[in-house]
Each structure stands twice: as structure tokens, then as C-alpha cells.
Amino acid sequence: MCISTIKHYHDMSEAPDQINEKIIRFAKRFMQIIREVYGCERVYMCTMCDGPNNHYHIQLIPRYAYEKRGSGNFVKKRKAYEFDKEKFETARKLIAEYAMEKR
């Protein structure tokens, strides 16, 4: 899962503090939702802004109990993605509720 700004920033240091604060608060809630809905053990948060078309974003990476721990989880073999509409809709509903609370 990825959280990004609409306005372009190369990395967190270029974004205004107000934007960074909102992103971190949102990421915290989104991590709780991911654990609740998808049943993962942990959610890693990272920002890697180092590509040719750099753009500030935060990645939330679920780690399940059966997966190895540590930074090796940031690079995983690609596998077929199994879309779970019910879980997706539950997460979307909870995120929308959080967004409405913060208005």
C-alpha cells in the first residue's frame, strides 16, 4: 500500500511539516486497519525516494507471522496478487470513516 502527496516533493524533507504530520497520522491509522483487516503480524513503513522520477511516498508493507523478519522483507519475490474484494471494501470503509473524522 502506498501513501503519496498530490503535490510533487522529492522527499520528506521538501514537504511542509503540516503535510508530513498528516501523512504520519494517516499512516498510523492505515497500519492499524491493515493489521485488523488482513491479519498480518506487523506493518513496516518505509520511504524510498531514489528513482529517476523521484516522488515522495510512503509504503506500508504487511508482514505475516509465517514470513521472515527484518529488512529482507522489503524485497520480495513477485507473486500473483490475489484480490480479496471483501477485505478491500472493509479497509476502504474504515479509511473513509477515518478521513471523515479528520475533516
Model segments located where?
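HIT superfamily nucleotide-processing domains
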Residues: 1-103
